[in-house]
C-alpha cells in the first residue's frame, strides 16, 4: 500500500520488511524506515480481508479528457486577504490571509469551532465576509459570486444527497443544477457511475447506501460540471480507514490533473497528505506551510521530532498562553 504524504510517499511493505523498488529518477538514500501507524496495520488487514478491489487509484477525468489535464491559469487559484466574518460581536473568522496555487492540495486543520466550515462557505460564495478580499478562479467573490460558483465544486460534511432519489437521479439532479443536459449530461452520468464504481447501485436510493458509497456519490455529484476548484468539508468523517485511503487516491488523481483541492479535516494523519496546510483555532490561522515545516517549527528539547498531533497541540497551547485574559 502507498499514499502520497505531502512532499513524500508513505509505502507500507509486507512483514518481511522488503524495501520498495526505487522509482526511476529517485535516490535510494531518500528511502528511510518509519514506525508503522495503527491505521497502516488496519488498512492492511482490511485489504487482506476484502481484497484490493476498491482501493485502486482513480483517474478523476471525464471521457475524452483523459490525456488533457485542466489548463492551469496564471496566478493563484484561491486568494484570501484579511478576511473577517463576524456574527454580532463574535469573530468566526479573524484576519485570515493565504493563497492556494492551481493544482495544489491545501488543507485546513482545526478543532470543531475553529472557523473552517465558515471560511469554506465564504469561499464558495454562500456567505459574505464582513471584510477582506477574496478571489476564486480569478473572480472577485464580492462582484462575481455566481460566475465563481460555476467554477467550483463543493462537498459538505453531511454529503447533501437526496435520500429518496436513486444514485443515477442524484447525479442527474446535481448536473442539471449546473446546466448540463442532453448528451453531455448522459456522458457525465456514465462517467461518474464508472469512475466511482457506482454502476451496480445506480438504481438504489442514496439513503440505502453505506456511508462509504454515500461519500463516493457526494464527490461524484460535486464533480459533474468539471470544476476547476473542489472544496471538501470534512469529507471522510465517519468512514473506515480503507475508504478514507481510497478517497485520498481520488483527491491525488484530481490534483495531478490540475484541479485545485481545498479540504478541511480534524484527522492529523490526513493533514499530512496535503501539499500545504493552515492550522486554525478560534477563527485565526496559527500556522501556514508544508506539514513537515510546521512540525519542524515546533521542535523542542522534549520534542525533537514532533508528530503532527504534537505540533498541533503545541500551537494551540502557545495561542492560549498569548491570549489576553478575559
List each language-model region with its residue ranges.
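ABC-family P-loop ATPase nucleotide-binding domain
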Residues: 30, 35-84, 319-326
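Conserved ABC ATPase "signature" region
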Residues: 172, 176, 183-201
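Hydrophobic anchor residue at the start of the ABC signature
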Residues: 219
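Conserved catalytic motifs of ABC-family nucleotide-binding domains
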Residues: 226
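Catalytic Walker B motif of ABC-type/P-loop ATPase nucleotide-binding domains
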Residues: 230-233
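ABC ATPase "signature
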Residues: 288-289
Amino acid at each position: 500500500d502507498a499514499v502520497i504524504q505531502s512532499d513524500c510517499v508513505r509505502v507500507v511493505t509486507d512483514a518481511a520488511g522488503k524495501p520498495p523498488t526505487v522509482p526511476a529518477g529517485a535516490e535510494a538514500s531518500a528511502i528511510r524506515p518509519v514506525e508503522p501507524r495503527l491505521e497502516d496495520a488496519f488498512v492492511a488487514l482490511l485489504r487482506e480481508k476484502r481484497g484490493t478491489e476498491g482501493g485502486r487509484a482513480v483517474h478523476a477525468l471525464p471521457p475524452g479528457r483523459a490525456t488533457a489535464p485542466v489548463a492551469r491559469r496564471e496566478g493563484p487559484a484561491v486568494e484570501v486577504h484579511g478576511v473577517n466574518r463576524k456574527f454580532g460581536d463574535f469573530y468566526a473568522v479573524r484576519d485570515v490571509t493565504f493563497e492556494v496555487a492551481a493544482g495544489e492540495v491545501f488543507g485546513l486543520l482545526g478543532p470543531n469551532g475553529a472557523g473552517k466550515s465558515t471560511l469554506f462557505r465564504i469561499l464558495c460564495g454562500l456567505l459574505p465576509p464582513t471584510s477582506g478580499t477574496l478571489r476564486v478562479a480569478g473572480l472577485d467573490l464580492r462582484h462575481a459570486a455566481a460566475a465563481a460558483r460555476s467554477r467550483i465544486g463543493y462537498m459538505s460534511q453531511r454529503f447533501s444527497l437526496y435520500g429518496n432519489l436513486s444514485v443515477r437521479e442524484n447525479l442527474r439532479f446535481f448536473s442539471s443544477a449546473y446546466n448540463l443536459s442532453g448528451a453531455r449530461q448522459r456522458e457525465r452520468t456514465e462517467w461518474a457511475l464508472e469512475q466511482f464504481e457506482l454502476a451496480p447501485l445506480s438504481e438504489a436510493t442514496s439513503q440505502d447506501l453505506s456511508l462509504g458509497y454515500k461519500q463516493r456519490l457526494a464527490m461524484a455529484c460535486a464533480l459533474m460540471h468539471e470544476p476547476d476548484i473542489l472544496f471538501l468539508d470534512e469529507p471522510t468523517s465517519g468512514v473506515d480507514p480503507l475508504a478514507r485511503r481510497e478517497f485520498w487516491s481520488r483527491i491525488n488523481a484530481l490534483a495531478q490533473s490540475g484541479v485545485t483541492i481545498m479540504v478541511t479535516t480534524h484527522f492529523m494523519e490526513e493533514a499530512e497528505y496535503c501539499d500545504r496546510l493552515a492550522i486554525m483555532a478560534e477563527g485565526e490561522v496559527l500556522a501556514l506551510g508544508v506539514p513537515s515545516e510546521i512540525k519542524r517549527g515546533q521542535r523542542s528539547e522534549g520534542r525533537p521530532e514532533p508528530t503532527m498531533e504534537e505540533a498541533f497541540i503545541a500551537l494551540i497551547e502557545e495561542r492560549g498562553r498569548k491570549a489576553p485574559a478575559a
